[in-house]
């Protein structure tokens, strides 16, 4: 098992070169490619994959008052969860609600494993990342068959187009109107064309952090100076569902490697 504390040592030892040593590229995609190649050359593995390995170990580790692990229900290494992420967010009968990856894991940990005060920390995100990798290579195929799924999708669509805050911005302004154009050091993704939901959770080399889609949503709200929705809240689930549905047909490849 590769320990998470090992990462800062490795990253700091990349030939004395920081993650920003590569000059700002005219093509942001080329910069991502070179950063990726640099890390693979010096470390032999990408940080996101290290976190996913850690997540697998935690997936099989008992925790909480019930003395159960995630694998107690979902099989060793999550063999019964293969392909599950490709259909998320979705409606869950035991919750009588629609849940994204993060919210579903939190619910399982609390209800079935007896874990109290679940936090959206690095350990939690490592588990989420590992679960997502179990759908790698599969097509995103979120459906809207249950009434609550359709309702949540519509809420997500409304949030997507809602102009908010002093900057009067919306998700759509950045990712529809100006999608494909460059802002600062990165290119704004287009939801449908870029199938954005297929590469989250992802490792962000710009801040050396592992992010789930919920973190990405919160980051966007912060950038437009609007108080972000809390983790595990319905706006998070609604926006995640909207993006996942619009990403249908895209091939899942997590953890992503992004700026």
UniProtKB/Swiss-Prot annotation:
Cofactor remark: Binds 2 heme c groups covalently per subunit.
NCBIfam families hit by this protein: thiosulf_SoxA
Name of encoding gene: soxA2
Record PTM: Cysteine persulfide at Cys-220.
Protein name (database record): L-cysteine S-thiosulfotransferase subunit SoxA
Residues binding heme c 2: 171, 174-175, 220
Coiled coil: none
Subcellular location: Periplasm
Organism this protein belongs to: Hydrogenobacter thermophilus (strain DSM 6534 / IAM 12695 / TK-6)
UniProt cross-references to Pfam families, sorted A to Z: SoxA-TsdA_cyt-c
Family, as annotated: Belongs to the SoxA family.
């Amino acid at each position: 098992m590769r320990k998470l504390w090992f990462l800062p040592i490795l990253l700091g030892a990349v030939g004395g070169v920081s993650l920003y040593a590569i000059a700002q590229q005219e093509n942001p995609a080329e910069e991502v490619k070179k950063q990726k190649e640099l890390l693979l050359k010096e470390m032999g593995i990408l940080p996101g994959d290290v976190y996913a390995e850690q997540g697998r170990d935690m997936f099989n580790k008992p925790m909480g008052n019930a003395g159960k692990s995630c694998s107690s229900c979902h099989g060793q290494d999550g063999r019964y969860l293969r392909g599950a992420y490709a259909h998320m967010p979705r409606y869950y009968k035991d919750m009588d609600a629609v849940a994204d990856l993060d919210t579903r894991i939190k619910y399982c940990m609390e209800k079935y494993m007896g874990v109290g005060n679940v936090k959206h920390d690095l350990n939690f995100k490592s588990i989420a990342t590992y679960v997502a990798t179990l759908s790698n290579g599969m097509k995103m195929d979120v459906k809207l068959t249950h009434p609550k799924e359709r309702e949540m999708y519509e809420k997500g669509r409304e949030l997507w187009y809602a102009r908010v805050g002093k900057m009067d911005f919306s998700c759509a302004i950045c990712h529809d109107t100006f999608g494909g154009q460059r802002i600062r050091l990165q290119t704004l993704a287009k939801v449908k064309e870029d199938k954005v939901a297929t590469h989250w959770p992802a490792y962000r080399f710009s801040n050396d952090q592992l992010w789930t889609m919920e973190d990405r949503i919160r980051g966007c709200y912060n950038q437009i100076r609007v108080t972000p929705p809390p983790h595990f809240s319905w706006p998070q689930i609604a926006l995640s569902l909207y993006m996942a549905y619009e990403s249908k047909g895209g091939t899942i490849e997590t953890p992503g490697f992004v700026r």
